Every structure is written in C-alpha cells, then in structure tokens.
C-alpha cells in the first residue's frame, strides 16, 4: 500500500508543482458575469509552500530563481513520497531547509503523507510584501504582555471550563480570512449583482459581503469574523472588514483592527489575493500579504470537527481526573 501511495505522491507532485508568474498577463481577458464584473466564482485552493515571513536564507531576495525552485521541487518530491507525517502550513518549507520531517504529534501519531494536498511552488520568497523585508512589523509591548499572560493562564487553567479552550478546538471558528495553506485551505466564491459570498473549507465559515453602498453595522456590534463591505476598483474586488469581537483573537484591542482584502483574477487558473491588516493592538505598523490562489475543479466537501462535541467532553473529564489524582496525592502526603 505504501508503495502505491509513494508512487501516487510523486505523480501528484509532478503534475501539480509549478511556479506561477507574478502579475497579470497583458493578453489575458478576464471572464465577466452578466453584470459586467470580473467573474471570480469557483473553487480556489491555497496550497502554496510560500512562507508567511521570508526565511533569512533568502536575504532581501523578493522572488525565487529557477535554481531555488529546482531545490524546493526536489525537497517537496522527497517529502510527498516519504510516507511520513503529513506536513501542513509552513511545515513543508521548514522540512526542506532543515532536511528532516518533524512529527506534528509524536505522542499519538498524525496523518501520513498520503493525506497531503499537492503543494504548489510560487515565485515569491514570502507572502509578506510590506514591510519590504518580508517580515511582520514588531509586536507591540501590549501584545507581548498579553501573550505571556494568556500562556500563564492556560498553564494554570488548561480546562477549568470549555471557555479555557480556543475557538478552533471548540469547533466554533478558525478565523476569517483563514490563510493557512495545505489543510482545509480551499475557498469557494459565489457572486450576485450586489453580494459576494466567500466560503472557507475550514469549518465552512461563510462571509456574505454586500457590494452596495451600505454603512458598517454600529460600532457596538462586534462579530467573530467582523463586518465586511465590498466594492469594485476596476477589475479588483476590495473588501473592508471592521467590528471584530475581542473574543475572535487573543491579541489586545482587536476591536480596532481593520482588514482590507483585494482579489484580482490574473489568469484562467490564478487569483491574486492581497491582504492588508491594520491591527494597532498587535503590531506596530500595518502589513500586507500576497497569495496566489489556484483554480481547481475539485469540490469542497463536508467539514467535520468532533461531532457531538465528544472531544470537549473528554478534555474536561480528563482534567477533572487529573485534579482528583492530584488531590489524592496531596492527601496521602
């Protein structure tokens, strides 16, 4: 079975790994809806191996050379045919540079490589294009302190109640937009004249974005995924999202965050996605990421977390058992 899996992985790698040019082909004619707007509809995959921040090995290099791509392709082929743990997000490029695959969960095991979506190589050395060094701006002192406080709280109170566990573990929300690659990282876009819907594969979170002149909801209304409004700037769909709830993030002053997304079709199979976040409670300056989403004929299937919420029941009951053992140990001292 493993031999078949390895052979299939190599085949998928050879079929799907390619380098996408940056920018739109001057001869490309964007398909349009009956309303005359660019047609962004369909299922788009974010399976890039491009890291969010630029690895130090690339220095100030913004784009990969052909030699860089050959190196990454060889490493990716080795990983996908290894039969070892599946690597999601930035695990692939880390393994290529480190020369070894580190298990995501060495205690209980993990998906193996047959579960990996075929990953894609794009030209950029980082998703962050601003700041120009390809790195996040410095964190605020407020955010650093909040992170320390949260880590200490979770150490002392890992499961006093279900609210001590993060939203994703509770299968409530994984954030929007969710930009992690290679695992439940498909989006489906549906358009009408006055609305765009973006469906995320992860948790099937859906954003319904009005395209008409309509003010944001009152500032007293806060939402996990914020309140989005969209408009067209030429052939680019622009989406502004405000009114984030404090519960949607562990960072301070989340309510002040404003995100701007820009979606531009740059080829029959390529959608350029730019994301600018102004998050003053978390970062000292705004930053911008760029990702190329690739068109796929695949469908988005049902998303399942832990049905019946049995995972949370076991987490909480397990912690109660640990508390009883600790109490019994103290009584015997």
Labelled PLM ranges:
Residues 1-7:
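Positively charged n-region of N-terminal signal peptides that target proteins for export
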Residues 8-18:
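Bacterial N-terminal signal peptides
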Residues 22-333:
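PEST-like low-complexity, intrinsically disordered acidic/proline/serine-rich tracts
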């Amino acid at each position: 079975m493993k031999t078949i899996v390895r052979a299939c992985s190599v085949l998928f790698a050879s079929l799907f790994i390619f380098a996408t040019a940056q920018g739109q082909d001057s001869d490309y004619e964007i398909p349009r809806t009956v309303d005359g707007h660019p047609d962004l509809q369909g299922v788009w995959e974010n399976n890039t191996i491009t890291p969010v921040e630029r690895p130090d090995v690339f220095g100030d290099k913004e784009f990969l050379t052909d030699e860089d791509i050959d190196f990454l392709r060889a490493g990716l082929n080795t990983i996908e045919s290894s039969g070892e743990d599946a690597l999601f997000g930035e695990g692939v490029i880390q393994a290529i540079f480190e020369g070894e695959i580190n298990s995501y969960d060495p205690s209980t095991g993990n998906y193996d490589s047959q579960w990996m979506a075929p990953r894609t190589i794009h030209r950029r050395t980082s998703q962050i294009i601003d700041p120009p060094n390809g790195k996040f701006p410095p964190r605020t002192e407020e955010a650093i302190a909040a992170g320390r406080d949260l880590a200490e709280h979770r150490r002392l109170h890992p499961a006093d109640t279900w609210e001590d566990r993060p939203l994703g573990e509770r299968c409530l929300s994984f954030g929007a937009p969710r930009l992690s690659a290679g695992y439940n990282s498909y989006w489906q876009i549906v358009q009408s004249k006055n609305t765009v819907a973006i469906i995320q594969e992860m948790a099937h979170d859906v954003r319904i974005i009005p395209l008409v002149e309509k003010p944001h909801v009152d500032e007293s209304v806060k939402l996990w995924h914020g309140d989005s409004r969209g408009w067209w700037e030429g052939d680019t769909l622009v989406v502004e999202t405000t009114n984030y709830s404090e519960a949607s993030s562990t960072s301070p002053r989340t309510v002040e965050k404003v995100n701007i997304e820009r979606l531009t079709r740059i080829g029959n199979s390529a959608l350029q996605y730019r994301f600018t976040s102004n998050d003053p409670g978390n970062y000292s300056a705004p930053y911008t990421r760029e990702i190329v989403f690739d068109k796929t004929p695949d469908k988005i299937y049902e998303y399942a977390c832990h049905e019946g919420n049995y995972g949370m029941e076991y987490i909480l009951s397990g912690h109660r058992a640990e508390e009883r053992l600790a109490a019994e140990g103290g009584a015997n001292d």
